[in-house]
Amino acid sequence: MNNIKLIAVLIFVVGCSSESPQSKFESLLDSEWSKIVNDNPVYASSMGDLSQNTEWSDTSVENIYSDHQHQLDVLSQLDELDISDFSDDNKVNYLLFKQQYENSIESHAYKTFLIPFSHRGGIQLQHETTSIVPFRNKQHYLDWIERISKIDVLVDAAIEKGKIGIAEEIVPPRFLMQKVYKQIELQAFVKPKDSPFYRTFLEMDRSINKIETEEIQKKALNVIKSKVIPAYVKLHRFFKDEYLPACRTPIGIKEIKNGKEYYEFLARKFTTTNLTPKEIHEIGLAEVARIRDEMNAIINEVKWDGTFKSFLDDLRTNPKFYYETSEELFESYLATSKRIDPELVKLFKVLPSMPYGLKPIPMESAPDTTTAYYQRPAADGSRAGYYYVNLYRPEVRPKYEIEVLSVHEAMPGHHLQIALAMELDLPNFRKYGGITAFVEGWGLYSERLGYDLGLYKDPYSRFGQLTYDMWRAIRLVVDTGMHYFDWSRQDAINYFLDNSAKTKQDVMNEVDRYINWPGQALAYKIGQLKILELRAKAESELGDNFDIKDFHHEVLKRGALPLDILEEYINQWIEEESN
């Protein structure tokens, strides 16, 4: 009997020790993905995993440091693997997975996790989580009530980080936090029935009968009154007494400790290149000049009798370019999307099976946020992708931007690219993750595809497309200007207004977004320029054999990639097609 046990142990040990490096890597991918899902209950709920549907993530400082140590351990495991026998696909997976951990580890050193507040999202807008978690039956509503009963844990963790940030002088600009302060007031000083957290209980799923609905609503009101509102009152007091007075006046991230080095890192991370902030700034200036020339050509075409500035002023103020109501604006977005969708077969071999819809941006965040954004579908197919549009003040949302915005956020932009990636046979970290330079570069590249889709038929719509291209070129200039050089917020606003037809409301919200999220805005134009460069090369070298459907398929069929790896794949495809 003992001999049999010994043989079994030996077989087990030999079996374990003979596991190939590739198998170890694939096991590591699986275990790390499981950890990501387990550590992020809201994300898990959004993906269709409801095993922790009553929980929040542990956002404490202690857990952040624990995660950091875990990432160091994972990186050590990756360094020990011999990848020489990996498949070509797994060599790419290894590179991307390792880069992800290296970036996270490098970012940790700058301690910006001690800035837990953003006017664009976060603890004070936690009710917006309802847009990504399910509410299809009674239990889902009860789960949400239990989840929000623990909101004080999130608030306490945010306050803890804020206090340490004050002590270490890692704090955000005060004027942005004044926006957060006002958003907190909307949570702290309301009657329970007027709380943003109660809104989801006003129109409940039809499968729930009237008696159950009333019971759930009563429970929700009790929790909002006893747990949610007191937590926000506490946060409001912290902001008023401690945080706002300690926030910094300068806007650039260079003002924190080692801030210039941090911004250089962010430039590399978001663009997936080794471009320096100075080089990116120069690229931006060149793009602004190029697009300005194209804009002037349209101004001449419409026989405008005035200056560039006066033309922009007319676009911003002439009532003919704006809808009077939010309802009219939303209907125009819907109609535009319906016109685009049937035309996509002209440019793409494969379209995603998951549909998308349109929704207004929630009223609490609309005044302080940008024109639109996209939300990916649920992994289990229970929720479509959504294109969110800003209906706040329709008098500053021009008609000539609707087409270009729609192709960027929905089809053939973000929804097409992201929903397709979710259907690919890729590791989960690639299927559900994203590389900003690729994702946003594709979105911006898609704006030019509007011409092929029958859009931009009048000069003003074409000027709208150029306005959006200019917008992303300006980002390269003002983001680097504010965070790396010595630009003020007003410098950035003035440069924006001088070179684009974006309205002042949009411009201020955009500039504030860049201040809040340094480096991210660099990805769009850098990514677009690379895709355009690769398309031009393919068209030149393949000549009559170039097929736009094939090119798009090659760009999209592996999901989001760093720009250098995308270039390798496209060059390989060009060579194969040439032969």
What are these model-predicted stretches?
Residues 2-9:
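Sec-dependent signal peptide recognition
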Residues 10-18:
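Hydrophobic h-region of N-terminal signal peptides that target proteins for export
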